[in-house]
UniProtKB/Swiss-Prot annotation:
ATP binds at residues 171, 173-175. Belongs to the DnaA family. It comes from Ruegeria pomeroyi (strain ATCC 700808 / DSM 15171 / DSS-3). Plays an essential role in the initiation and regulation of chromosomal replication. ATP-DnaA binds to the origin of replication (oriC) to initiate formation of the DNA replication initiation complex once per cell cycle. Binds the DnaA box (a 9 base pair repeat at the origin) and separates the double-stranded (ds)DNA. Forms a right-handed helical filament on oriC DNA; dsDNA binds to the exterior of the filament while single-stranded (ss)DNA is stabiized in the filament's interior. Oligomerizes as a right-handed, spiral filament on DNA at oriC. Domain I is involved in oligomerization and binding regulators, domain II is flexibile and of varying length in different bacteria, domain III forms the AAA+ region, while domain IV binds dsDNA. Residues 91-126 are annotated as: Domain II. The gene is dnaA. This is Chromosomal replication initiator protein DnaA. Its main location: cytoplasm.
Length: 468
């Protein structure tokens, strides 16, 4: 097959796939040879060859065979001078063939030459959320190490650990800390070039650079930053070309002693389909886990949010126990917890009511159902009996000795706090007791927590053991 014949086929492909697809994926193909039923093309990158093979190979094979060429499959090879190959203005053979065939087609223009500053305008950092600062980040035992490491990096001093990798589940504060670092660096070290973006944005911009043949500009941009921050790095798992470019960018920045900060939803070694060399690089710095929030941290987050809402809802009253109730019932996701509080304040302001337990349970019924604890009454009974070194039958049974009655009341209180069971249901699980007995026991423990330090400590120890 001649270059002129391939040029004619290109015009047919242009009409079939459209201008954008043709310019991006078909026009860069260079026909080289037809050998033993295999049509060989050169491409700028492996990524482009793989994409064309997966998405356009059937169409190209059809057009080749329809034109009388016996082609069984396509082969793509990366050009020797790629990726620095200059953009071509137009394919002379294709233009000549089109003219000879008198086929009028839209002009296929080459990507325009741009300077680095123009590309930089198109690769701006992701916007930072003004709410996500260190001042608004509530610190507790589950996140204190991550917070301390983020603080150290945000000082902009000598690079002591590279990269810093923050990982943890959804809604635990990874993105908050990433934004806080960026904000702090902008204030303390405004001369530094800080680039924050998600791994998804990194991939899309990499693909854009491939399409527009600006890989050298792309490499220069990402290698010229002083601090590179990539959120949700697990997104590039399984994307070989993006991982390769990320790996080379990573190495180049580390070699220049530039700071890299990464976040992920799990430890680097546990990210499936992430290349071993990328995992190894991520693990060579400081890897910090943001643990699931405990009760104290959740309560602190709620108290901080309430203070913020006071400016918007100055007249709203929130009853005692509501924040504690929410901190106990919504334990898996801080975003859900904050969203529940936002909904609660908005609803109360619209209906003009105090935020009490009744309104809370009505307004957040769906959230509370979704966050319902898996802790059972039986589990609480066993844990309390073990803690006080008494038999399970003594907690459930009719004995009224103080050594049994107080643990029984503690168990009832924990059942009320940690399960969705009603008072009558709890009473039935405690030897068929009346709901008023349960109510009395719960109230008694609430009173003793304020006056008896040992009871307060017992309840908290048991709560932590049950929530662990």
């Amino acid at each position: 097959m001649t270059q002129e014949k391939w040029g004619l086929l290109c015009q047919k492909l242009l009409k079939t796939v459209g201008q954008n697809n043709f310019t991006t994926w078909i026009e860069p193909l260079e026909f080289q040879a037809l050998e033993n039923g295999v049509a060989v093309f050169t491409v700028p990158t492996n990524f482009m060859g793989n994409y064309v093979s997966q998405n356009f190979s059937d169409l190209i094979l059809y057009e080749l065979n329809n034109a009388g060429e016996a082609v069984q499959r396509l082969a793509f090879r990366v050009a020797a001078n790629s990726p620095m190959r200059p953009a071509r203005a137009a394919r002379p053979a294709a233009a000549a063939a089109a003219a000879a065939a008198a086929v009028e087609a839209p002009q296929v223009s080459a990507p325009r030459a741009t300077d680095t500053s123009d590309v930089l305008d198109g690769l701006q950092a992701a916007p930072l959320d003004p709410r996500f600062t260190f001042d608004s980040f509530v610190v507790g035992k589950p996140n204190e190490l991550a917070h301390a490491a983020a603080r150290r990096v945000s000082e902009g001093g000598p690079v002591t650990f590279n990269p810093l990798v923050l990982y943890g589940g959804v809604g635990l504060g990874k993105t908050h800390l990433m934004h806080a670092i960026a904000w702090e660096l902008k204030v303390k070290r405004p001369e530094l070039n800080v680039l924050y973006l998600s791994a998804e944005q990194f991939m899309y911009r990499f693909v854009q650079a491939l399409r527009e043949r600006r890989m050298m500009d792309f490499k220069h941009l990402f290698r010229s930053v002083d601090v590179l921050m990539v959120d949700d790095v697990q997104f590039i798992a399984g994307k070989d070309s993006t991982q390769e470019e990320f790996f080379h960018t990573f190495n180049a920045l580390v070699d220049q002693n530039k700071q890299i900060i990464i976040s992920a939803d799990r430890a680097p070694g546990e990210i499936k389909d992430l290349e071993d060399r990328v995992k190894s690089r991520l693990q060579c710095g400081l890897v910090v886990d943001l643990h699931p929030t405990d009760y104290e941290l959740r309560l602190g987050i709620l108290q901080t949010k309430v203070q913020m809402y006071r400016t918007t809802y100055p007249d709203l009253v929130i009853a005692d126990g509501v924040l504690e109730f929410l901190a106990h019932r919504i334990s898996t996701n801080v975003r859900v917890l904050e969203g529940a509080l936002t909904r609660l304040f908005a609803f109360a302001s619209l209906v003009g009511r105090e935020i009490d337990m009744e309104l809370t349970q009505d307004c957040l019924a769906d959230v509370l159902r979704a966050s319902e604890r898996k802790i059972t009454v039986e589990e609480i009974q066993r844990k309390v009996s073990d803690y006080y070194n008494i038999r399970l039958s003594d907690i459930i049974g009719p004995k009224r000795l103080r050594s049994y009655a107080r643990p029984r009341q503690v168990a009832m209180y924990l059942c009320k706090q940690l399960t969705s069971r009603s008072l009558p249901e709890i009473g039935r699980r405690f030897g068929g007791r009346d709901h008023t007995t349960v109510m009395h026991g719960v109230k008694r423990i609430e009173e003793l927590k304020l006056t008896d330090g040992q009871i307060a400590e017992d309840v908290e120890m048991l709560r932590r053991a049950l929530e662990a």
